[in-house]
UniProtKB/Swiss-Prot annotation:
The keyword Metal-binding applies. One of its GO terms (biological process) is regulation of transcription by RNA polymerase II. Its main location: nucleus. Disulfide bonds: none annotated. It holds the Pfam family Sgf11_N. This is SAGA-associated factor 11.
Length: 96
């Protein structure tokens, strides 16, 4: 009797999981078809295992090649150091 209850519960569980997976897949298929009909020029995201391109297929720029002008002190600061610079720059201004 225990074995039949166990097999019955496993069968019910597998049936529920299968139904949920089928529901998710069918919803996603309908969603993809709607997106393709609304936006026919829509292109998929690019995946680069080397990390040389972004999700839109464009080559990544080096962060050190971009500079921002700090309006507080007037210096040009590298993009990858701008947040740290701004914090120091604003804190030193408040002390005065």
């Amino acid at each position: 009797m225990t074995q039949s209850i166990d097999s019955m519960s496993i069968s019910i569980y597998e049936n529920l999981i299968s139904t949920m997976i089928q529901d998710i897949v069918s919803r996603e298929v309908v969603h993809q078809k709607q997106m393709q009909s609304r936006y026919p020029q829509l292109k998929q995201y690019s995946i680069d295992p080397n990390g040389n391109i972004d999700i839109n297929g464009n080559t990544k720029q080096q962060d050190s090649s971009q500079y921002f002008h700090c309006k507080n002190c007037g210096r040009d600061v590298s993009a990858n150091r701008f947040a740290a610079h701004l914090q120091r720059c604003l804190n030193s201004r408040q002390r005065r």
